[in-house]
Amino acid sequence: MPPILILLTLLLPLRAGAEEIIGGHEVKPHSRPYMARVRFVKDNGKRHSCGGFLVQDYFVLTAAHCTGSSMRVILGAHNIRAKEETQQIIPVAKAIPHPAYDDKDNTSDIMLLKLESKAKRTKAVRPLKLPRPNARVKPGHVCSVAGWGRTSINATQRSSCLREAQLIIQKDKECKKYFYKYFKTMQICAGDPKKIQSTYSGDSGGPLVCNNKAYGVLTYGLNRTIGPGVFTKVVHYLPWISRNMKLL
């Protein structure tokens, strides 16, 4: 790996909305019906937003660092700035971050949101399937990540419309070179350092979709350069997800 890449692989300070879609393309409206926009207010009074995805009629999965007060979820959106008839805006009844979440090393950065009311299934609103226990995607497999992020690093505004980029699953040893706090049992690393098409700021909590299933939850990426993003490995947390959805 070129030395300059090594110098630039500093972790972004984790803040709400810390990851975004760079490059990629706008998707066909409502073709990713599982996508959610999570909005909330931080302790400093500022409004923030993250990505997320519907996994059951009452539950959305997102990143644990995407939390605050006045939480609500927008489902069925394509143009997030427009008042679309397909949109369902539902307050969050309860936020359940993983109890082992550590904001210092970004492990267990996963959270369930229980909605106050049941999501109405339509062509624009559908849950995303989770993988089976012990399922895995091999390095080299092409997956996708979607969100309402900036279209370039220098852009000052995020995209109004949902965009998607294709990412390549990286080898664990390569991920360790980029991220010294990378834990292969709990995380997946995906991207392509050679292409301007990766994750950056604004869509933390969005899904890494492989074979039409959610294999990861976006947690963080690289600072000052485009490269792989790190995702919380959904398979590792399936027992916790299942247990909490049954209890609530």
Curated annotation (Swiss-Prot):
Glycans are attached at N106, N154, N223. GO terms for biological process: killing of cells of another organism; proteolysis. Residues 19-20 form a propeptide. This enzyme is probably necessary for target cell lysis in cell-mediated immune responses. It holds the Pfam family Trypsin. One of its GO terms (molecular function) is serine-type endopeptidase activity. It comes from Mus musculus. The keyword Disulfide bond applies. Gene3D superfamilies: Trypsin-like serine proteases (2.40.10.10). Belongs to the peptidase S1 family. Granzyme subfamily. The active site is at H65 (charge relay system), D109 (charge relay system), S204 (charge relay system). It is found in: Cytolytic granule. This is Granzyme F. Keywords: Cytolysis, Disulfide bond, Glycoprotein, Hydrolase, Lysosome, Protease, Serine protease, Signal, Zymogen. Residues 1-18 form the signal peptide. It is an enzyme of class 3 (hydrolase).
